[in-house]
């Protein structure tokens, strides 16, 4: 089941002490070559399992840097992630897991062929490693790029899980953005491919500006994220509608993801899979075609 949560609906105490634990996505199966090796060496699979560093979650932070984001928003977004990672609440949530550590990578995205890894896979297991990741996020120059391809971000993220040396109880892609997909393949195709791999996708739709006909903004970006972007056991959306609560929203979402919990007080359940989405999942492509004819 997928849920939407507004800022303030989740308190730190609830994240750490209350609510039901989200469904755990099974780790991706070993590749065919590894499976063949294990069939010839019965002890190999067990040995590999013990040798692989275990973490509570493999977390990919996929951050929109398209031109629809203004420079202030990009700066606040960066600061929000950096401050959340070093916050007392985050570090406390980190220690609540069975392994007391997570693996995280952070990349920025725009068009379907435009993704840039800012933080390669790192383990966060306490204040020192959290500080190192936060500092690395902040020291990288802010950039902007054209087009918005959520599908491209998901497709770029999926193989990153298989390339990292860690083994998590959950695999989560955390997508933030301020507009619908308008480039690359359909977002639902990418989303469904991720779900099939046991990956959970959570969303952070940014709605701090009034939609304008001259832009790619849409009125119900939160519905779009709920119905077209997020998916997997316990998937949820945290919507930002107030610039002043930008950083709070990021911290709330990261706390939930690290603690492996769904929001305590879900506000609006996502539309059932058998029903039509409340917003067309191709609305971004349609707007682009109507305005620019390509």
Q: How should each PLM-predicted stretch be described?
A:
Residues 23-60, 66-75, 195:
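Acidic, polar low-complexity linker/tail segments
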Residues 238-294:
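C-terminal "exit" segments of structured domains
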Residues 97-136, 213-226:
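Short beta-strand-loop
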Residues 62-72, 104, 120-121, 136-147, ...:
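Second-shell loop/turn segments in exported
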Residues 53-118, 129-176, 203-216, 220, ...:
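Von Willebrand factor
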Residues 64, 157, 169-183, 194, ...:
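DG-centered beta-turn motif at the end of beta-strands
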Residues 94, 179-227:
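VWA/integrin I-like adhesion module and closely mimicked acidic/polar interface patches used
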């Amino acid at each position: 089941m997928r849920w939407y949560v507004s800022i303030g609906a989740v308190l730190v105490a609830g994240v750490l002490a209350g609510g039901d634990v989200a469904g755990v996505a099974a780790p991706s199966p070993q590749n065919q070559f590894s499976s063949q090796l294990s069939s010839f060496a019965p002890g190999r699979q067990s040995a590999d399992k013990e040798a692989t560093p275990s973490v509570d979650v493999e977390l990919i932070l996929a951050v929109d840097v398209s031109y629809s984001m203004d420079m202030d928003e990009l700066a606040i977004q960066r600061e929000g992630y950096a401050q959340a990672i070093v916050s007392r609440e985050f570090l406390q949530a980190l220690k609540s897991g069975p392994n007391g550590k997570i693996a995280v990578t952070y990349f920025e995205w725009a068009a379907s062929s435009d993704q840039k890894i800012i933080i390669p896979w790192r383990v966060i297991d306490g204040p020192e490693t959290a500080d190192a990741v936060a500092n690395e996020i902040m020291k990288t120059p802010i950039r902007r790029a054209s087009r918005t391809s959520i599908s491209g971000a998901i497709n770029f993220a999926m193989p990153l899980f298989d390339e990292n040396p860690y083994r998590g109880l959950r695999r989560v892609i955390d997508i933030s953005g301020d507009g619908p997909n308008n480039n690359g393949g359909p977002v639902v195709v990418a989303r469904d491919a991720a779900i099939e791999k046991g990956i959970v996708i959570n969303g952070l739709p940014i709605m701090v500006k009034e939609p304008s006909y001259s832009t790619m903004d849409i009125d119900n970006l939160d519905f779009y994220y709920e119905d077209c972007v997020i998916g997997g056991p316990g998937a949820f959306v945290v919507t930002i509608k107030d610039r002043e609560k930008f950083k709070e929203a990021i911290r709330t979402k990261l706390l939930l993801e690290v603690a492996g919990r769904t929001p305590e007080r879900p506000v609006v359940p996502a539309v059932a899979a058998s029903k039509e989405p409340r917003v067309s999942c191709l609305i971004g492509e349609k707007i682009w075609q109507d305005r620019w004819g390509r």
